[in-house]
Each structure stands twice: as C-alpha cells, then as structure tokens.
Amino acid sequence: MQICQSIHSDHARQLDTAGLRREFLIENIFVSDEYTMTYSHIDRIIVGGILPVEKTVSIGDEVGKQLGVSYFLERRELGVINIGGPGLITVDGQVYEIGNQEALYVGKGAKEVTFNSLESSKPAKFYYNSAPAHTTYPNKKITLAEAAPQTLGDDATSNRRTINKYIVPDVLPTCQLTMGLTKLAPGNLWNTMPCHTHDRRMEVYFYFDMDEETAVFHMMGQAQETRHLLVHNEQAVISPSWSIHSGVGTKRYTFIWGMVGENQVFGDMDHIAVSELR
C-alpha cells in the first residue's frame, strides 16, 4: 500500500516537478495478477487497479491489518469500473459479469471480493475507488446505458464531452462515493475548462485510452498559483479540495473521476473564469 499524506496549498506551491509528481501522481495502477492500492489521507480515499490475467485476484487480509479492521470493506464502500476485457467480480458468492465500461458498486460489509478475467488474452482492467462508509447499501451493477449522461462543452472551445455518471445519487445510493467516466468528442482535447474547485469534496482523475506518445497536461493548484503534471496512459492524479483539476491532451483521451467528501451534489462547484487563472 502506498500512502499519500495531505498537503497544504502553501506547501504545494513550493514543490518542483519531482515533488509535485511524488505528492499527487499515481504512476502505476495496473500490475498483472495483482492489485495496487494508494491510500490518501485526503478524505481517506483509496485508489487502485486490479488486473487478473492468469489467476484470481483478491484484496487480502493484510490490507485489513493496515486499515485497522478485520477485512477491507468492513468500514468501507467500493466502486469499480472495468476499462479492459470482460471479467467477473464475485462478492460473497454472488457473481457479477462486468464488461468494458461497466461498473459495480459494493456496499460496506462485503467480506470476500474476488476478480477474474473471462479471457487471459483480453484481461479485465478493474479501476477502483473506495471510501469510508457509515452504513450498508445494496451492491449494484451499472451499465453504460444505465449511467446518467450529461453532455457539456463545445467543439469551438475543444471541450465537448459526455460525462457518464455511474455511481451518483440519481442512479443508486452510496454513503459518499461518486464515480463516473468522461469521454471527449472527436477532435476535442480539454476537460473541465473553464475549471472549478469544490471545497466540500476531493477528487481523483484517472486518465486512459491513450497511446504511448500521448500525454495530458493536467492543471492543478490554486487559481492564482497553477501548476501542471504530465500524465500518461493509465495514471491517476489526486486533487485536494483547494486545487483546480483540468487537463488538455496531445490527443483525445478518456478519464474516470471519483469524488468523496461532504456531499454528493455534482453541481456543487466554485467556478473559476479563465481570466482569473494565473
């Protein structure tokens, strides 16, 4: 388990490139036949990937010990979105087949969660977020058709995109976790510009669908003290509540966003005009 501490905005503005990458970038999400896990002190979110190729992968008892509980989801909820081939997630004996760009929500208290691919030649890639939970809500599979879509932006500003909200109150109840997948329209490169912050929630962006020579310039920091990270395929960025989070790619890309915090109101944002950025 990789642990990322909370960091004050005054500290972050002093960091060089290596320091920013160390504090905010998760470089390695997928490892064959293993799970990865990054624990952030910011709202206690956990971020990672599970890539079952030749064998079943489960999050073991050692994680419970690190979290001070008997098992991973004893006091947590889990959201998973598959960006690879079709796979199976088994939750306490209940099997869910999860295809590409399909999601599964797992409620607090699930004791045994395992992950498999249907074909080792086209393995599933399960990207997940987990947040502390106070009660148990039902497990639920969400297909792309069942997600709540919202199209924003314009071709003229190169930010036309469709936000597919998988794990949000309009689709299913959760304690605090929300997740979705944003697809840019052909010829568009920007996400979330004009940008915003939300003091009530932190967020993690996971970028994918990028070839080796594609990169995203992910903008972060306070509006008057912006910085950037160069993000490559299947890497994630932790965004504190005080930071903007926006990106522009050298080519089109897709990203998954996940939020935890005070509320689940998607539109609760503090918008920032482009003219205010520095």
UniProtKB/Swiss-Prot annotation:
UniProt cross-references to SUPFAM superfamilies, sorted A to Z: RmlC-like cupins
E.C. numbers: 5.3.1.17
Reaction it catalyzes: 5-dehydro-4-deoxy-D-glucuronate = 3-deoxy-D-glycero-2,5-hexodiulosonate
Cofactor: record remark: Binds 1 zinc ion per subunit.
Positions of Zn(2+) binding: H196, H198, E203, H245
Keywords annotated in UniProt: Isomerase, Metal-binding, Zinc
Pathway participation: Glycan metabolism; pectin degradation; 2-dehydro-3-deoxy-D-gluconate from pectin: step 4/5
Broad EC category: isomerase
Family (UniProt): Belongs to the KduI family.
HAMAP family from the UniProt entry: KduI
Protein name: 4-deoxy-L-threo-5-hexosulose-uronate ketol-isomerase
Originating organism: Yersinia enterocolitica serotype O:8 / biotype 1B (strain NCTC 13174 / 8081)
Top-level taxonomy: Bacteria, Pseudomonadati, Pseudomonadota, Gammaproteobacteria, Enterobacterales
Gene: kduI
